Amino acid sequence: LDEGPRQRAVASEGATMPIHGSLFQAHAENQSTDPFVQQNKKLLKISMAYGPVWARTGSMVAYQGDIRFENRGSGGLNKLVKSKLTGEGVSMMYCTGQGELFVADSASEIQVFYLENDSISVNGANVLAFSASIEWDIHRVNAGRASMMAGGLYNVSLRGTGYVAVTTKGDPVALDVGSAPTYADADAVVLWTSGVTMDVRVDTGGMKSLIRGGTGELIQMAFGGQGYVLVQPAESVVEGGHQATEKKSGGLGGLLGG
């Protein structure tokens, strides 16, 4: 005899109910064992088997294993003083241990590349994570009159050998500054490579300049030399003298088209 729906429901209690759909398969963990792996465009997986890493404070979204986090703020007294004096800096945490660390920043796109005895200059708002083998510091990108008028512009320099992950608002473009004179809105520039020279231009024409056909951008960066500048399709917001993002695997050549 049919027990009826109530009896069948009681009998099925404790049984494992299957979940239908491809949710867990489509979003399964990337099994690559590389040090820095893009789980997807907006989530980075870091294997701690390769040693300690620096990650942006607050960027951890998950981890598996035994990982310890030490918030070192701006990275030591020297960097702290520079951060306070310039208004530019990035708060980082030192990550050690074993396992896999997943980091992200407000669902921004993530770009990964490898530095080999090289250096780059990065907008502090775009720094996400990098190998502990890489040295970093806060530096002034231009000391000219235009930069002084702009209130000073400061970046984070990364130098050495190891992996680097930066964030961008949307898919960026890598411009070869050696092919033609290159200019960009200072608030849209993510980074530039060694060998690139930069000068700051300030549009003092205001509304008249805009009416005459100007860009309407107060601060522009003019690039020369040899190398690449990475530009995102969105501007950062200048807050208190420093740049901050809006509300918030391959080598370097692979990222920049080299």
Predicted regions and their residues:
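N-terminal amphipathic/basic-hydrophobic helices that include classical n-h-c signal peptides
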Residues: 1-16
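Composition-driven recognition of glycine/serine/threonine/acidic- and proline-rich low-complexity segments
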Residues: 14-258
